[in-house]
């Protein structure tokens, strides 16, 4: 039996559904790696406003009792997972219930904001500690793209409805004034989502009689807002579940005659439109396909016409470091995805297209608050997930995903922009 296959099962976890979570790495290599990881944990806690609290009641780290605490229930299992699998192991350990925190987002924000200064480059918390290479597949073939989308967006419309607002919008909202009101209430989220959509439609010049293409439908709110302006909109998606519910929502709003929602890869769309809009879709394209994605945007908008996209970004050097590896997010949440950097978007549009960037507006603090509201809503309704067929491991996975994402925006590790581009050439 090899070191890699010698593992101890974790109790009460479905090993068929969660094979990696159900097994704790065993053997001499795992033990040696665990010793290093344990020293790293303790070293990190002494340098950060963070407390590590162990199952025997001992604690290390910040002296301030107000500092966020990470409760370690199975220290050896956590260390073995981190030692062998880095961030993936850290996430799988949370999924297995081996550690927890009453202030999960604060813990992750502290770690995210300090990786470059406190942890050696090969041991960054928010990157793989030991390189885990991505599964090999062709350059995001159409079949692979459909499978990647289905893993996340076809989970269940009821799951997303449990924590999204009435607009069923699954992207960064735009609140009125976060300086005056830094923690908006849940009741403000739907209006903030419509405000975000309206800004995109404004910069895209969508008005009465416009012919608009949307790449990435979501659940149809942008279609509804565009049609309410008198525009005709075609929207394409790879999600069967999203297409079904989006069509229902559009019909219920009375705009079925103005909106067409197709199950179609963006690479197969033809024709030209007055404007093109795409909200947080580039993240799923895959970095090898980014030039093709922007070339498609250029080809699909009329000469002189606007393109409006919303995109989550990460620092350029971290994007380069992670593009050939697999992270916990890619393994469990968004397979095949990668966040671009602002530099990548600027370089690709400049080198591969005739699209000219005319505006880029950051909404970073808005995304932190959007994710906070989603996370709080998700936790309020967490107990109902079992009725949808999702177990406790899934619930912990999604709690970590939402908190991890919120921490990324709060720490500045992640950003999100609304970009306006114009296709150069005579109208």
Swiss-Prot record:
Transmembrane segments: none annotated. Keywords: Cell wall biogenesis/degradation, Lipid biosynthesis, Lipid metabolism, Methyltransferase, S-adenosyl-L-methionine, Transferase. CDD domains: AdoMet_MTases (cd02440). Gene3D superfamilies: Vaccinia Virus protein VP39 (3.40.50.150). GO terms for molecular function: methyltransferase activity. Its EC number is 2.1.1.-. GO terms for biological process: cell wall organization; fatty acid biosynthetic process; methylation. The keyword Lipid metabolism applies. The keyword Methyltransferase applies. Inhibited by S-adenosyl-L-homocysteine. Signal peptide: none annotated. PANTHER family: CYCLOPROPANE-FATTY-ACYL-PHOSPHOLIPID SYNTHASE (PTHR43667), FATTY ACID C-METHYL TRANSFERASE (PTHR43667:SF2). Belongs to the CFA/CMAS family. Involved in the biosynthesis of the tuberculostearic acid (10-methylstearic-acid or TSA), a constituent lipid of the mycobacterial cell wall. Catalyzes the transfer of the methyl group from S-adenosyl-L-methionine (SAM) to the double bond of oleic acid in phosphatidylethanolamine or phosphatidylcholine to produce TSA. This is Tuberculostearic acid methyltransferase UfaA1. It comes from Mycobacterium tuberculosis (strain ATCC 25618 / H37Rv).
